[in-house]
């Protein structure tokens, strides 16, 4: 284990010495933790301490238990692009106005794939219709949905242009109010969104389904799913039917289908912290004077998720630079120590009365990180976590 993680355990361990918990850290991670514990003989942490340590970290991440993916996770490319965008990575796609608006009100993004065992609705002349059901029960009750969109992939169909056929067709998205019955072949629906799309490019088409998802989650109405209807022009029925990928091809493998299958994306806020934002690289602050080596300042601390065996459910990042504050707050306090008036007074009193403690070196500025992970239900989640990175230290 890297030295930084030892510091993390040393810094956080006093907060978790409150009792035992079920074993959560995988055996590999447990051995790495124990092997790195200072002293390592009689002083190394017990299984109960390690378990409680991880339990507290999971609670900080808003998880009740450690996710245990059953197989290699399928992460939609959309979520990887969204993570790169909000973590400020180079090469991230430019955000659209709609995405920026949705993310500006949310600190959590979740994705859902539909259940593929549903029946195909009766075919109508010139139209292809499918019923889609997305199980949203994994959304926490305290999470308020601010926006939701249904994404459908459209494949470039050059033959439509070669045959001089129309390369436009309409996609309609309906909410199912009442499902089909024995007496009625068609469900009762409500139109949510509609768009005229073209076949001259391969791209994702996004449709606003916020009203339906809010009714299901906030108002507790029954989720009967959606109907996706593709209206084909008479001269391009075959091409447009192949263009919009709302069902899996007969011989299509699982991996390729997972990259283009319909996707429901929800944007929500759990009432904690700030919404997602595009992280910009911070400019280094100019030092006003040469600091003493022992004075209060920020030190390196890298948290590697593989050291506790979490790399099987945390997709990105593999770790992050958390940093920590350490050092002396000597009298008199210099300007660069970013002190409060109270800290200045306390340090002054300490200089004449040693019973009064000195001011402490603590974080004065913290920033958030974005994490992409699989939750307990193997749903892909992008979440913004506040106060994870120390940006500045001072005497307080």
From Swiss-Prot:
The modification Phosphoserine is found at residue 87. Keywords: Chondrogenesis, Cleavage on pair of basic residues, Cytokine, Developmental protein, Differentiation, Disulfide bond, Glycoprotein, Growth factor, Osteogenesis, Phosphoprotein, Secreted, Signal. It is found in: Secreted. CDD domains: TGF_beta_BMP2. GO terms for cellular component: extracellular space. It comes from the Eukaryota. The keyword Lipid metabolism does not apply. Residues 1-23 form the signal peptide. Disulfide bonds join 296-361, 325-393, 329-395. InterPro entries: BMP2_TGF_beta-like (IPR047953), Cystine-knot_cytokine (IPR029034), TGF-b_C (IPR001839), TGF-b_propeptide (IPR001111), TGF-beta-rel (IPR015615), TGFb_CS (IPR017948). Residues 274-293 have a biased composition (Basic residues). GO terms for molecular function: cytokine activity; growth factor activity. PROSITE patterns: TGF_BETA_1, TGF_BETA_2. Residues 24-282 form a propeptide. Belongs to the TGF-beta family. Homodimer; disulfide-linked. Interacts with SOSTDC1. Interacts with GREM2, RGMA, RGMB and RGMC. Interacts with ASPN. Interacts with MAFP5. Interacts with FBN1 (via N-terminal domain) and FBN2. Interacts with type I receptor BMPR1A. Interacts with type II receptor BMPR2. Interacts with ERFE. Interacts with BMPR1A/ALK3; the interaction may induce HAMP expression. Interacts with TGFBR3. This is Bone morphogenetic protein 2.
């Amino acid at each position: 284990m890297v030295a930084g993680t030892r510091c993390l355990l040393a810094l956080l361990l006093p907060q978790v010495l409150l009792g035992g918990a079920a074993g959560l850290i995988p055996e590999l991670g447990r051995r790495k933790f124990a092997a790195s514990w200072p002293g390592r003989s009689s002083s190394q942490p017990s299984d109960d301490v390690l378990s409680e340590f991880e339990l507290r970290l999971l609670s900080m991440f808003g998880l009740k238990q450690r996710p245990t993916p059953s197989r290699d996770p399928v992460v939609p490319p959309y979520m990887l692009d969204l993570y790169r965008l909000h973590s400020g990575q180079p090469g991230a796609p430019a955000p659209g106005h709609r995405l920026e608006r949705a993310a500006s009100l949310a600190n959590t993004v979740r994705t859902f794939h539909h259940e593929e065992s549903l029946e195909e609705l009766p075919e109508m002349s010139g139209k292809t219709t499918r019923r889609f059901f997305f199980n949203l029960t994994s959304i926490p009750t305290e999470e308020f949905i601010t926006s939701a969109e249904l994404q459908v992939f459209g494949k470039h169909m050059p033959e439509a242009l070669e045959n001089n056929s129309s390369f436009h067709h309409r996609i309609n998205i309906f909410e199912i109010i009442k499902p089909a019955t024995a007496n009625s072949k068609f469900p009762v629906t409500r139109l949510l969104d509609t768009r005229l799309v073209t076949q001259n490019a391969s791209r994702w088409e996004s449709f606003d389904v916020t009203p339906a998802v809010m009714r299901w989650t906030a108002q507790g109405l029954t989720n009967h799913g959606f109907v996706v209807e593709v209206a084909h022009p008479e001269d391009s029925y075959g091409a447009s039917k192949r263009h919009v990928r709302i069902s899996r091809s007969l011989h299509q493998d699982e991996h390729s289908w997972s990259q283009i299958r319909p996707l429901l994306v929800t944007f929500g806020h759990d009432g904690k912290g700030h919404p997602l934002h595009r992280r910009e690289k911070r400019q280094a602050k100019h030092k006003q004077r040469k600091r003493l080596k022992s004075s209060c300042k920020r030190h390196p601390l890298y948290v590697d998720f593989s050291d506790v065996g979490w790399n099987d459910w945390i997709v990105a990042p593999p770790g992050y630079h958390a940093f920590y504050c350490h050092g002396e707050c000597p009298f008199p306090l210099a300007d660069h120590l970013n002190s409060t008036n109270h800290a200045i007074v306390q340090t002054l009193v300490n200089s004449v009365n040693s019973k009064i403690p000195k001011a402490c070196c603590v974080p004065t500025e913290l920033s958030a990180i974005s994490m992409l992970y699989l939750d307990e239900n193997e749903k892909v989640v992008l979440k913004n976590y506040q106060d994870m990175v120390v940006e500045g230290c001072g005497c307080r």
